[in-house]
């Protein structure tokens, strides 16, 4: 059975799951063919028990969320402020809400033949996240990212170089989708 995987970058969809479930279902309806075995993997924010996560959803063409992955390794001062609770008087940072870490990584199955390891943003730098999934017969590494905050620096190029290193290191194809190209 042929499966089509569409991949959007980290910040392509700014809704919050499950709060914006109807909007997420509309994404499936607008961008996936209901007569085909199509999937959309896209970045989003998720909220569970008053914790926010930098996440990615796998939607199918039947408007269902088939899987959700939440980021394990957060960017300090970008996604959380270290020691915020210990040093509250130094609370001069713009982001008032910290993202939470997931602490788990499981490959996402597209069908019975293909599984991929999802990585968000700079998680591609940490090979231990991939090592945890090697025994689960993964066929692909998918890295979605928003490199726009790097601006006109060498950052996006270095980030891309790490993705290439992971492909060589593990002998597994890496698909990297960035909102800046």
Q: What do these predicted regions represent?
A:
Residues 1-181:
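Enzyme catalytic cores with a strong preference for nitrogen-chemistry domains
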């Amino acid at each position: 059975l042929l499966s089509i995987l569409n991949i959007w970058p980290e910040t392509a969809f700014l809704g919050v799951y499950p709060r914006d479930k109807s909007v997420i279902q509309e994404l499936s309806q607008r961008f996936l063919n209901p007569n085909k075995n199509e999937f959309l993997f896209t970045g989003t924010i998720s909220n569970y028990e008053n914790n926010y996560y930098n996440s990615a959803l796998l939607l199918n063409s039947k408007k269902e969320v088939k899987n959700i992955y939440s980021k394990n390794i957060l960017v300090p001062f970008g996604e959380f402020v270290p020691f915020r609770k210990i040093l509250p008087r130094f609370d001069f940072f713009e982001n008032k809400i910290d993202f939470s870490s997931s602490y788990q990584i499981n490959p996402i199955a597209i069908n019975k033949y293909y599984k991929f390891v999802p990585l968000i943003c700079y998680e591609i730098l940490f090979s231990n996240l991939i090592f945890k999934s090697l025994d689960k017969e993964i066929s692909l590494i998918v890295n979605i990212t928003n490199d726009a905050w790097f601006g006109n620096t060498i950052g996006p190029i270095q980030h891309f170089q790490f993705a290439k290193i992971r492909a060589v290191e593990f002998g597994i194809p890496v698909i990297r989708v960035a909102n800046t190209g």
